[in-house]
């Protein structure tokens, strides 16, 4: 029983076979996105059953009534017209306002403690940590490539593992600056609720706060050529002490 529960409640930070729901949230914005999705689904289910009930009632009434048209002199109904006009408008308002609020909050960049510059290439990612210098007084930077199947270690995820992961401290406001060196790419990591297009010659940015340790995978989400599927993203969240130790090793 314990084995079943442990397997059932394992944190899902990567795509899995037959997965039909979101990956487990690892940031406040992803938690907000999941909550918004669930709220919208609540309204959609009500609309689905309400409209379905009306349609079924009309069909049954048409079949069971000898005279399908109960009142041939009825040209309009003010009450029903008000209902089917005002009700959808109220539902749209209930959906739109939380959506606009979340969109605004996600666009805000909180005062960051750390900045990471990301540049997309065909077909790999380049990272820079402009806040830190290595032993040669140069900015910490590296490239991140897909690990081929022949070099995968036991337990590693195919088409998702990379040779150099992005290491970030947990519970720290991080700003990502995203650009491209060739064609349009898109930097996305579902568990963190982030997706930012990378345009050549243009800088986009977003902010993220990872609220727990873990390894989070993403992929380029803009078709960018023949090896588009070979641009995985691996972000590893560690404690501040481990992050500082990693910096000293670079």
What are these regions (language model features)?
Residues 37-62:
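Alpha-helical transmembrane segments
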Residues 2-39, 59-250:
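Non-transmembrane, membrane-proximal soluble domains of secreted or membrane proteins
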């Amino acid at each position: 029983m314990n084995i079943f529960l442990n397997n059932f409640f394992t944190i899902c930070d990567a795509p899995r076979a037959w997965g039909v729901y979101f990956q487990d949230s690892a940031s406040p914005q992803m938690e907000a996105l999941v909550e918004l999705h669930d709220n919208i689904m609540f309204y959609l289910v009500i609309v689905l059953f309400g409209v379905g009930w009306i349609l079924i009632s009309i069909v049954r009434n048409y079949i069971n009534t000898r005279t399908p048209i109960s009142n041939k002199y009825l040209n309009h109904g003010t009450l029903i017209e008000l209902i089917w006009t005002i009700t959808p408008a109220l539902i749209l308002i209930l959906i739109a306002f939380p959506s606009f609020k979340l969109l605004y909050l996600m666009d805000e960049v909180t005062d960051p403690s750390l900045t990471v510059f990301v540049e997309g290439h065909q077909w790999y990612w380049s990272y820079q940590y402009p806040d830190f210098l290595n032993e040669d007084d140069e900015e910490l930077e590296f490239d991140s490539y897909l690990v081929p199947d022949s070099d995968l270690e036991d337990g590693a995820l195919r088409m998702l593992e990379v040779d150099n992961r992005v290491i970030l401290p947990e519970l720290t406001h991080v700003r990502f600056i995203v650009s491209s060196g060739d064609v349009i790419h898109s930097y996305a990591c579902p568990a963190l609720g982030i997706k930012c297009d990378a345009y050549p010659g243009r800088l986009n940015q977003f902010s993220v706060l990872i609220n727990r340790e873990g390894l989070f995978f993403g992929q380029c989400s803009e078709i960018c050529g023949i090896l588009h599927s070979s641009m995985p993203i691996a972000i590893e969240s560690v404690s501040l002490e481990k992050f500082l130790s990693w910096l000293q090793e670079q």
